Every structure is written in structure tokens, then in C-alpha cells.
Amino acid sequence: MKRILFSTALLMAVSFSFAQVKNVKDAKSIVNGSDPDFTKAESLIEAALVDPTTKDEPNTWNVAGYVQKKINEKELESAYLKKPYDTLKVYNSSYRMIQYFLKCDELAQIPNEKGKIKNSYRKTNAPILLIERPNLINGGVQYFNLNDNKKALEFFSNYIDLATVLMLEKENLLKQDTIIPQVAYYACLVAARIEDYPSIFKYANTIASLY
């Protein structure tokens, strides 16, 4: 009887694992369709991001970033066609996309059982991060104007912090990006508004180190 129960439980676990893998594939397929249901795609991939069977797979996070990329492209298409579009949706999509691709890269950098690193995602995703990074300023400014200082700080701080991630180290952004001190100033400003003193100290030091 115990053996039967164990076998049943094992079968259910395997079935659920396959279901989450299918969710990842389905999410990507949906956003690539002619009439994508982005809400459904996000729901599928978000379930996979927290499930033990798929949350540690780089591809899960890569697809999550890809879903956000397609959402972003759809909104920008509407803007190009002079149709109504949601600017905050664009900025938040860029923010999430960047976080997902960073997590994908982190997991892909873990050596395999032979001690080798086979990161097949960085070459494609690093240029996307560079393209989307300015939207972190745009989003920060919009949240600043809406007096949502916590969200503004999230956007400004992520813009600055991206300059030092391994994924973009070849770009030497701390030296090449002359806007960083200005963004750091605004990060300090919104941090002061919410009395986030560690962030004030952190980004004040960023400003000092770049002058």
C-alpha cells in the first residue's frame, strides 16, 4: 500500500513538473501569436517562476523577460501608429524585463556538473538591457512626478546599479555613461523624501566617486 501511495505521489510530482515546463513553452508561444493574450502569458510564466521544478532554470527567466519584451513592443507599436498606449506599462515592462534577464544570466553562469559555464543567453540579452536601460530613467521621472518616491527610487537605482553588473561589464558604463551622476542625484532626492538613508549614502558616494 505504501509503495502504491509513493508511486502515485511520484507520478503526480512528475506530471506537475511537466506542466510547468509546458507553461514556459506556452507563454512564449502565446506572445508570438498574431493576437497574443499577454495576461494569460504572464500568468503562465509567473507560475513557473515560483515553482520548484522550473524556478532555477535560466530559460524560465529568459522567457519571462521575452514576454515582457513582447508586451513592450506591442505598446510601442500603438504609439507608432498614433493609438492610445500606456507609458507606465512600457516603463514597468522594461523594468521587469531587465530583472528577469539579469536572473537568467545569474543562473546561466552557474557551472554545470563538469565545472563548465555555458551561458547561451548573454549574447542576446545584454544588448537588450542596454536598449531598455534608458526607460528606467523615464519611469523614474514619471513616478517622481506622480510623487511615488519609492517606485521612482527603484527605477533610478536600477539604472545606476546596471552599470556594474557582470552582464554589461564590457560596456564600462561607469566611465562611458555621463548621465549616472545626474540620476544618482535624483536617487538621493527621492530617497531623502522617504527617509531611506542607506540609499542616500550609497548614491551620494556614487556621485562623489564619479567627480
Question: Where are the predicted features?
Answer:
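Bacterial Sec-dependent N-terminal signal peptides
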Residues: 1-29
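Canonical tetratricopeptide repeat
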Residues: 63, 172, 179, 186-189
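Post-signal peptide N-terminal segment of secreted/secretory-pathway proteins
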Residues: 32-151
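Generic helix N-cap/helix-start motif at coil->alpha-helix transitions
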Residues: 19-23, 96, 131-136, 176-186, ...
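Conserved structural position within tetratricopeptide repeats
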Residues: 47-50, 106, 161, 205-209
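Structural signature of tandem alpha-helical TPR/SEL1-like repeats
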Residues: 195-202
